[in-house]
Amino acid sequence: MATVIVEGDFEKALKKFKKIIEKEGILTEYKRREFYEKPSVKRKRKERAARKRLIKALKKKGLL
């Protein structure tokens, strides 16, 4: 995890910290692991995400 050192304004430091947290996906990972997810639910979520990526790629190429 990156260390943020900003001298001066607290708001700037907080904004930079939030940006780093969002970029590394720490908050989303925490929310996802907050409760137990059954393997079948996890598999369906991953399949849904893969399908979404495929459709997005096809739309980008103009095939859909």
UniProtKB/Swiss-Prot annotation:
> What is a single Pfam family found in this protein's UniProt entry?
Ribosomal_S21
Superkingdom of this protein's organism: Bacteria
| Disulfide bonding pattern of the chain | none
Task: Tell me the protein family, please.
Answer: Belongs to the bacterial ribosomal protein bS21 family.
Q: What PANTHER family does the database record attribute to this sequence? A: MITOCHONDRIAL 28S RIBOSOMAL PROTEIN S21, SMALL RIBOSOMAL SUBUNIT PROTEIN BS21
Protein keywords: Ribonucleoprotein, Ribosomal protein
Q: GO terms for molecular function, please?
A: structural constituent of ribosome
An example of a Gene Ontology BP annotation on this entry?
Answer: translation
GO cellular component terms given for this protein: ribonucleoprotein complex; ribosome
For the keyword Ribonucleoprotein, the answer is: yes
Q: Which organism is the protein's source?
A: Sulfurihydrogenibium sp. (strain YO3AOP1)
Q: What is this protein called?
A: Small ribosomal subunit protein bS21
